[in-house]
Swiss-Prot record:
Residues where Phosphoserine is found: 2, 208
PANTHER family given in the database record: TROPONIN T, TROPONIN T, CARDIAC MUSCLE
Family membership noted in the UniProt record: Belongs to the troponin T family.
Phylogenetic classification of the source organism: Eukaryota, Metazoa, Chordata, Craniata, Vertebrata
Designated name of the protein: Troponin T, cardiac muscle
Amino acid sequence: MSDIEEVVEEYEEEEQEEAAVEEEEDWREDEDEQEEAAEEDAEAEAETEETRAEEDEEEEEAKEAEDGPMEESKPKPRSFMPNLVPPKIPDGERVDFDDIHRKRMEKDLNELQALIEAHFENRKKEEEELVSLKDRIERRRAERAEQQRIRNEREKERQNRLAEERARREEEENRRKAEDEARKKKALSNMMHFGGYIQKQAQTERKSGKRQTEREKKKKILAERRKVLAIDHLNEDQLREKAKELWQSIYNLEAEKFDLQEKFKQQKYEINVLRNRINDNQKVSKTRGKAKVTGRWK
């Protein structure tokens, strides 16, 4: 609530208090006037009653003078209408209008004071609620700003991570392409020099006078196929990729081994079947030959 509204409210309250005081003063003046009018009416009625009583007495005296001694012998009639005299209020039982007015003013003042206190209490509560609402709004705004900052930082980290991942993949792709190119060039150079290598091997075997056994050939082939594992210069992501690559190569080798074993089993089974057929055919041919010879000699 602004200062202007507070000043306006205070001015309105002062005007209401002044109007209440003026109404009370007017009400007091009206009561005084009514009391004065009531007193004047009572005095006028008393005076009229006194004048009437005096007139009645004078008329009775005149009648007595006219009637003479006849009326003196007659008994004097009693008047059935007594003289009406306004009752006078004793001093101890008089109504104190000032006291009534004072009590009423005190009551109105207390009610007004209670209304003013209730108004200020409500106003204080509203101000406290407004302050708490502002604090709540500021706290919520700060929390929202903090959440937005954290969200922006996470998004920035995610973008940086994606950029690093993209750069790493590009680097791996380039390195793989370079290795493939080098491997192809090496294979071509080996193919070009393969004939000379075979001749040299034959010459060395002829000179040595002995041939390599199958075990030695296997060891030599494995030594040529086995590659040196250089992982000292690789980071965590590259090591993870290298592990995946090795796992894939092992998986492929195991699959190839399984296929070769199944193929070997199939070939072994076929050899056994063919061998059994050959044995059966040889047995049948021997029995047929013996029967023919015996029949011929008979």
